[in-house]
Amino acid sequence: MHEHIICDITPPKLAATGVEGDEIDICNCWQINYGQKTSALKYKLNQADIAIREIQDMVAAGGRTVVELTCGGLKPRPGSLADISRATGAHIVMGCGHYVHDFQDKRNHTRTVDDFAAEMIGQVLEGAWDTNIRAGIIGEIGCQAPWTELERRVMQGALIAQQETGAAINVHPGRHEDQPQEVADFFLSCGAPMNRLVLSHIDRTIFDEGRLLKLADTGCVIEFDLFGMEQSYYPHSDIDMPNDAIRLRLLRKLIENGHLEQIVISHDICHRTRLIRYGGHGYQHILRNVIPMMRRRGYSEAEIDTIMVETPKRLLTFV
């Protein structure tokens, strides 16, 4: 429930240099992934022809729907998503709203909560990014650790938009282990429906079972969305990135404690090096590799169906 097909997530400081760096190929993709080489091209998913082939691979593996959460600050292109959907037969559900503070348009700094809310309501009900293509989910709404005042205003606007449209909200929390809980507590304090809140990137943020279960007890949906990132190296903070086996072990702990219906999984592909054609695993990885692993590790077909079909279907239904 969290991918990017067309986006540009180039860090602002790197973008300001104007340097694109090396072309990505099979010989340097791992050096780029481990930070030994820098290539701004890593952060650009802007090749519609490549995207079509990558999504076709997912469809061939049995996938039917992609939740595409490229939002304000990441250069969304709704028209390209529509073209890719038509070319592949895949359903693409588009997000809306704004990413973290540093990526946002400077004009956002003076905007009000009501202004952000009206924008997101319009993106869901009428069309987003100067098109008539409507968003089907709000997000990924970005926040950093610590949370900035601008990000809080966007989040408050997203809550109003949720109330008006019935769409679910996906939040990108900061990388501090306390921030997912901070976001969940904020939603609780606002009286928001917790089963309509998806907290992304939990598999790079929370590694303690007690902390994970406390978060789940709020009723939010917990998203492990970095499946396929198997290396322990993580450039953004000093953590040991879990592999897919550890992800499945933590999800089993959630299930054992009654939280099966609060789990969604994905890849969050936002780097070119994670595409098959640049040496990566692609959008088909969960279908071809993770689900067979789940079966080998004792996940029932009913559990897999809940995670892969029923919970996403519930979240993508407006209420």
Where are these predicted regions, by residue range?
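Divalent metal-coordination and catalytic microenvironments
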Residues: 2, 66, 98, 162, ...
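Active-site beta-loop-alpha junctions enriched in small/polar residues
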Residues: 4-6, 71-72, 97-101, 140-143, ...
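Short acidic/histidine-rich active-site segments
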Residues: 170-172, 224-226, 258-280
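Active-site gating/metal-coordination segments in enzymes
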Residues: 65, 83-86, 91-165, 221, ...
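Catalytic pocket-lining loop regions of alpha/beta-barrel enzymes
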Residues: 159, 163-253, 263
